[in-house]
């Protein structure tokens, strides 16, 4: 399979090169046509989770050898069960729990695999120098990426996060990360500033001598990050068949809390590969740029930025939407035009035809902090089910999109213990300033378990304290790459 840039179909790459490079030379994202794979989804569903994952990844990334072994090595000892992502019935819906990995966030599913994909890609491409991973994070990606890449030979990783824009637990997870090849730095600005800064570094270094090193990304702009996320849509569907809730071929709807659009795009990939996905519901918080876009076709980032209790969705520039625009339009020139207008003017409007194609698959909705808190409290009171604010946003939106003829799967992206203040407040409890004490308080109140990776986090030594302006990000990276 040949990948190409979303902005220029002549800029092609093998799957190994696409994973290694992360982003296309023109700033576009690498894309393939998942509908052209003729993937045997029924056969995949008959397999265990890891073999299913290997089949899906081999279909999407065919230039990698020994994918089954790569997948099994990637997940060995990192998740409590071989199913990775359990599906839990809650009221009239199903919650797909994606947070049982080593950092208690859904990013672990993909970022357990990506380091081995990049190392394998570097070997296949004959690369001799280090692969330098650059990542912007709104909270969860950074820790999951560092956990995946720490002390992996031939790699280095630098993570940027918005100063004051992540939870205390998320910041502590990153600041205490061990590893001789990891750096994390706060950026004065929001996530979009950090993400734009990373993209600008890629552009600035395109023709620069990096002493044999190569830049790549662990964000979902890298197809190697996106591809593993497709797997859990298949896993959830298979679990519903196994439980007798649906028959093979029945449609299933999914509601996804998303900011950068990667997690929900993985669901669209699954649908294009043949999985009977009905509707994909895009759930946003108060930063509702995606809700407006999927309702009107107008994408406008010129709006207030809100810090919410679901910070991983506090995003105004959704990078992976670019891939969807290409898949729906089939026109790289059109996508390039839209992206240029977004960069220069801060907005764009898609045609009525494109909007109709999007709305045939995607629904949308948004939920503010008060709405999310109401859901957290209600689910605990009525179902004794504890969820985090991102999941609560998704649940709230799913309630207005649930159809009787199709089961609704709500993707749960993080442990509630990563956001103890918001969860305790939603349960009507008094909260203080110490999020680690609040984790214990939440445990005592609900009897639910604190994830082992979060317990004792406050006592670990802080290893990373850097804070810089966005304009200093390039020099920060070069000081490491060129040393």
Tell where the protein language model's regions lie, with residue ranges.
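PLP-dependent amino-acid enzyme catalytic core
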Residues: 1-483
